[in-house]
Regions:
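Active-site catalytic motif of lipid deacylating hydrolases and related acyltransferases
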Residues: 1-53
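Short hydrophobic segments within beta-strands
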Residues: 5-9, 60, 130-132
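Short, highly selective alpha-helical patches that border small-molecule cofactor pockets
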Residues: 16-20, 69, 140-144
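Conserved alpha/beta-hydrolase fold motif
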Residues: 58-60, 80
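Gly/Ala-rich beta-loop-alpha elbow adjacent to hydrolase catalytic centers
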Residues: 60-69
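Active-site signature of alpha/beta-hydrolase-fold catalytic machinery across serine-
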Residues: 71-75
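The alpha/beta-hydrolase serine catalytic core
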Residues: 79-165
Length: 165
């Protein structure tokens, strides 16, 4: 099985992460670094083209990567798993406007027009949602409420380190 892993905002594709190692037990895992400050249209196009070019069977994404997985997976007909997904990035990304350093030390600038253009989580695809109840960024209860009518949503206890690292 070919698995595409899509990292979250301010992170990077790290082949040594526990999530990647866990996914490697299921198949071949590929991914790429994504600059979310470039906007939804560019990110979507990059991930879609990457998925098409790598014969992907499953997309797994975390946080904003889970959001992106919902759009790419739904539009390409590829099953996806969204872990602690951002469901309304046009709201949640407002906290990161301006110029900052991300989790890996790179500088990014996030503009309000870029944030406002992010659509909500896409429903209608073949997906599964996993939420950690203690996630500090994505509200698990909101995710459960919003996505349960559309997807199987699995809630895990607080601090599941292999999902949040």
């Amino acid at each position: 099985m070919n698995i595409l892993y899509v990292h979250g905002f301010g992170s990077n594709y790290d082949t040594t992460s526990p999530k990647i190692k866990m996914l490697e037990e299921l198949g071949t895992v590929v991914g790429k670094d994504v600059d979310y400050s470039s906007g939804f249209k560019k990110v979507y196009a990059e991930i879609k083209d990457f998925a098409l070019g790598n014969d992907i069977d499953l997309i797994v994404g975390t946080s904003l990567g889970g959001h992106t997985a919902s759009h790419v997976g739904t539009n390409l007909g590829i099953p996806f798993v969204a872990i602690n997904p951002a469901i309304t990035p046009s709201v949640s990304l407002k906290d990161y406007l301006g110029t900052h350093n991300d989790f890996v030390g790179s500088t990014y600038t996030l503009r309000e027009d870029i944030v406002d253009a992010w659509p909500s989580f896409l429903t209608g695809g073949c997906g599964c949602i996993i939420v950690e109840m203690g996630d500090e960024i994505c509200d698990a209860n909101e995710t459960i409420t919003e996505l349960t009518p559309h997807y199987e949503v699995n809630a895990l206890p607080t601090e599941v380190t292999y999902l949040t690292t």
